[in-house]
């Protein structure tokens, strides 16, 4: 083996190492963004499932009057672990009573409770004692009093539970991709259950 072969072989290995470092430098940021995206997307899906389950469970409990008012909201907030619905979310529990007579045929809001410090409005409008807004036309019509021969509403009462959570990513991904999360650096997740 000559000295020329050894020198050329070493130069080739150094060139291959340099190319490998260049490939790593180009691919590493892409891999980091992908890993961060997978982590945050997984947490977002988990948060969405938790919010949906909390609203459904709350609707079920509220419709059966197992827990009411502040006790129900406290129980629902604690069931949302690991997400903090006290500071980063809001829960509304609204009971709507059907119309009861021809003189009072319209449904009305019987009670409304809420808990959590995040500033978001309920989709059910109106105050206690007033006709609710935000229900579908079909649901609203089922709550209206119907005169003879029925002389009643189709449904006597419904419970509406709305759960909102402001999801924020835990990775620095929003620093890499601008305008990824438009609402205060996060996404507002909401779910409504009617029982």
Predicted regions and their residues:
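N-terminal leader/signal peptides at the extreme start of proteins
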Residues: 1-17
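Mobile, glycine-rich extracellular loop/lid and propeptide segments
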Residues: 3-6, 26-30, 55
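N-terminal single-pass transmembrane signal-anchor helix
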Residues: 14-43
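N-terminal alpha-helical signal peptides/signal-anchor transmembrane segments
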Residues: 41, 45, 54-79
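Extracytoplasmic beta-strand-rich oligomerization domains located immediately C-terminal to a leader/signal peptide
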Residues: 65-107
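Soluble periplasmic/extracytoplasmic beta-strand elements of cell-envelope proteins
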Residues: 90-95, 160-164, 190-194
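Intrinsically disordered, low-complexity regions enriched in Pro/Ser/Thr/Gly and acidic residues
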Residues: 99-187
